[in-house]
From Swiss-Prot:
It is found in: Cytoplasm. The gene is murC. PANTHER family: UDP-N-ACETYLMURAMATE--L-ALANINE LIGASE (PTHR43445:SF3), UDP-N-ACETYLMURAMATE--L-ALANINE LIGASE-RELATED (PTHR43445). It catalyses: UDP-N-acetyl-alpha-D-muramate + L-alanine + ATP = UDP-N-acetyl-alpha-D-muramoyl-L-alanine + ADP + phosphate + H(+). It comes from Lactobacillus delbrueckii subsp. bulgaricus (strain ATCC 11842 / DSM 20081 / BCRC 10696 / JCM 1002 / NBRC 13953 / NCIMB 11778 / NCTC 12712 / WDCM 00102 / Lb 14). The lineage of its organism: Bacteria, Bacillati, Bacillota, Bacilli, Lactobacillales. Cell wall formation. Its EC number is 6.3.2.8. This is UDP-N-acetylmuramate--L-alanine ligase.
Amino acid sequence: MLDKTKQIWFIGIKGTGMASLALILHDLGYKVAGSDIDKYTFTQDPLEAAGIEVASFSKDNIKESGQVIVKGNAFKSDNIEVAACEEKGVKWQSYPDTVEEIVQQYTSIGVAGSHGKTSTTGLLATVLGEAAPTSFLIGDGMGKGVKDSRFFVYEADEYRRHFLAYHPDYQIMTNVDFDHPDYFKDRDDYASAFQTAADQTKKGLFVWGDDERLQKIHPKTAKKYTYGLKDSDDFQAFDVVKTTEGAKFHVRANGEDLGEFTIHLFGDHNVMNATAVIAIAFTEGIDLDVVRKGLVKYTGAKRRFSEKDFGDTVVIDDYAHHPTELRATIQAARQKFPDRKLVTIFQPHTYSRTKEFEEEYVEILKGVDKAFLTPIYGSAREAAGDIKSEDIASQIPGAEVIDFDNLKDLLAYKGDCIVFMGAGDIPKYEVAFEEMLGK
């Protein structure tokens, strides 16, 4: 249990969710510190800015009293601090269980789904924050705790069924599209986790109406609402106009036109994400003009279509690593930069996922003007596999595998839209390329 008289020590504090949670608890008046690998990660910047200690792993960090230990999901007994807890008889609590403590203190809204969680959570937090004090936990390393909050908005990760620790008032489910083949047995096993999460939702479940798996999910207690583009949806987006500045659209609820809304986000998926946010706000009785203000204010999450200009060259960084996410990112780039050639640098993420979706990756990357792939990014669980990036590139006309030794080949595409996509260390390639552009 969280305790303000004790230090809250995070094992793995630089993980995206852990960093967000540490920031929230710090804002709420807890004494927060933690440890992680020494290698730089972008999540440490807000931690350091908040004055939160980030130490190296050491058994000496674990005290026999005076601490509440929060353990990151990735760390097992082979971690020196987890081992120290076991040796000293010090109990720890998991990241999901700690988040659940916060969930129960406020009107809570979880955002689940195979794709779109981070962007939708950020958008929802911004909109609700315009209406009332709102704490939030976002999977891009950002978190904020606001005392006397009315709302708590959080990203609910389905991996290893972590989100089943939560019992929110409301939940958005953006889609159910098979992922994490290293853990889930098959598509039915994956979907069953979302059914359980729906059963644990108390008041309202908001699902994308076009998703076949979500159509089959029926919560035990909460009322189910659909959002989408169809007349049959409870919250229907219509008269959608997409431009190089974003999108404008109307939303209909119970036959009533709620008026026009504007977002400075790109791609069909973001219209759907915004409609889900509008549905939550409408259900909670929030003034729609306040909702409009929040929608316009939000410009995106970290590593979600993050855009930089280098003269006439546009560089975009995106977390996309699942086929559905690649499609959405490519569509968004085409929408915003219709007159530029589209060059993609994709880093496949984990061998099991790459093998599972090989055919889809080939199909998608055939649709860009020039496709590059970096070597596959493995994981602690999968250090090697029986597929490599060359296997994908060989099936795509003109595609190449790129690494740091031939990264300069990208300079031939100055003036184009260059998109780096992946969930591993693809930002290292982007930074190296940007340094070349700056010379």
